[in-house]
Amino acid sequence: RNLAREATHSPTRHPAAGMLAENEKGPTMRIVIKVGTSTLAHPTGRLNIQRIELLCKVMSDLKNAGHQIILVSSGAIAMGFGKLNLPERPKDVPTKQASAAVGQCELMYTYDKLFTEYNHTVAQLLITRPDITGGGQQRENFHVTLERLLELGALPIINENDTISTEEISIGDNDTLSAMVAASIRADLLILLSDIDGLYDSDPHKNPDARLIPVVERLDDHIRALAGGSGSSLGTGGMVTKLQAAQIATEAGCEMVIANGHHPAALYDIAAGQPVGTRFLAGRKDL
């Protein structure tokens, strides 16, 4: 993995950021938040209780402020192999799918318990590629159900259905999934929380003078060349998938931010348009 460093953010507003907080949409937004495995779990695969509690508290507060929150959560496989006492993340498909089946139960139990403390109702949606990219009834059902859940005030929690997904119907990573969801429901903002702080102009592991890029106005070959390898040992994503997600989201008119999930309270600053991580500016939404 390239391009990682401890998260920092300034209290000053970047002149190109914060458009969503100040434009004609008003103070509330439709926000998709993707949480990576490294944010939710310790390296052992066991749940990082302190972090997930704070994460749910902040998302509940943002929802109380009037924002619509959709959570795309990784972590099922990692929590499953931890609970099954496997020594490391499984590599064969049957064990991955078995771990997902066990871990998804623990994941949703935890979310339901924590969000209930703040009087919010959660809903689980486990999907595969045809549910969101197909042109048939599956896609329509997913979209209608998700919109209805938001109308009813629920907090949808989405994950790929790893227990039944095959290569043919797999989306592959939740960076891409979250961007597809954001595009599908015309979200205003997509936030990717992971163990990386954003996009750097060079590898900060090798270059101590590497600088975080606060704003990307356009995804071009130079920006894509900055992407490094794959993600952490617990997850499946990396900077490459995050830039692919940025392409999907921004083309649909949705801004995207990459930030470090080790600091969940940073969600407040991100929603307010403060310069946290790297913000990818969106194209204009179709009318």
Label the predicted regions.
Residues 25-287:
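C-terminal catalytic "cap/lid" subdomain
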